[in-house]
């Protein structure tokens, strides 16, 4: 595992992204994607995961927010992958149930070096402000695939779409923080001997 600050830049015809990540940080966020609601969710994720995360994204938001949201997920996933593997000396598995008022979301994840996403959230509304709620799943799919983690996100209940999405980001944050908890007794957390 790599504990230093990692950096990655990704430039396409649709987005220009620069990102810095420190997996054992203190929850410091410096986020600018040009999408206010998405920035708010990434700041909540950073705070509760205790990662340090700096993101600058300039995207074709005049088209829609899809490219920016998905590409931020891709870059975050790639940095997590670089930081995590080969995995050693951490819990590996993490889970969290997070509530926000009437909304409750459960997250379970495995730092398995095996990419998989189960996403069962049923957002009440198609938009929060100008943000298309279907992009939340696209973001988490990009993170899971590019980080090679197995990620399950399940809405237990909820009516307010903002609350549901925020509980989703926070449950992922807390589960990731727990999976990254150091445990020197574990060594490589797999009977295969490598992850």
UniProtKB/Swiss-Prot annotation:
Family from the record: Belongs to the imidazoleglycerol-phosphate dehydratase family.
GO biological process: L-histidine biosynthetic process
Keyword Cytoplasm in record: yes
GO molecular function: imidazoleglycerol-phosphate dehydratase activity
Stored CDD domains: IGPD
UniProt-annotated location(s): Cytoplasm
Catalytic activity: D-erythro-1-(imidazol-4-yl)glycerol 3-phosphate = 3-(imidazol-4-yl)-2-oxopropyl phosphate + H2O
Chain coiled-coil ranges: none
Keywords associated with the record: Amino-acid biosynthesis, Cytoplasm, Histidine biosynthesis, Lyase
InterPro entries referenced in this protein's UniProt entry, alphabetically: IGPD_sf, ImidazoleglycerolP_deHydtase, ImidazoleglycerP_deHydtase_CS, Ribosomal_Su5_D2-typ_SF
EC number: 4.2.1.19
UniProt cross-references to Pfam families, sorted A to Z: IGPD
Pathway recorded for this protein: Amino-acid biosynthesis; L-histidine biosynthesis; L-histidine from 5-phospho-alpha-D-ribose 1-diphosphate: step 6/9
Assigned GO CC terms: cytoplasm
Record-given protein name: Imidazoleglycerol-phosphate dehydratase
Protein's UniProt keywords contain Lyase: yes
């Amino acid at each position: 595992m790599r504990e230093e600050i990692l950096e990655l830049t990704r430039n396409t015809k649709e987005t220009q992204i620069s990102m810095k990540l420190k997996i054992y940080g203190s929850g410091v966020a410096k986020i600018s994607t040009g999408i206010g609601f998405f920035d708010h969710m990434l700041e909540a994720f950073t705070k509760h995961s205790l990662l340090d995360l700096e993101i600058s994204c300039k995207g074709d938001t005049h088209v829609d927010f899809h490219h920016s949201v998905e590409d931020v997920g891709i870059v975050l996933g790639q940095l997590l992958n670089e930081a995590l593997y080969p995995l050693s000396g951490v819990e590996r598995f993490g889970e969290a149930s997070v509530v926000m008022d009437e909304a409750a979301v459960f997250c379970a994840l495995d730092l398995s070096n095996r990419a998989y996403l189960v996403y069962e959230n049923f957002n009440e509304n198609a938009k929060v402000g100008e943000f298309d709620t279907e992009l939340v799943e696209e973001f988490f799919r990009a993170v899971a695939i590019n980080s090679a983690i197995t990620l399950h996100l399940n809405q237990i209940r909820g009516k307010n779409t903002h609350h549901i999405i925020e509980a989703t980001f926070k449950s992922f944050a807390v589960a990731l923080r727990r999976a990254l908890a150091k445990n020197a007794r574990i060594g490589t957390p797999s009977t295969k001997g490598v992850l």
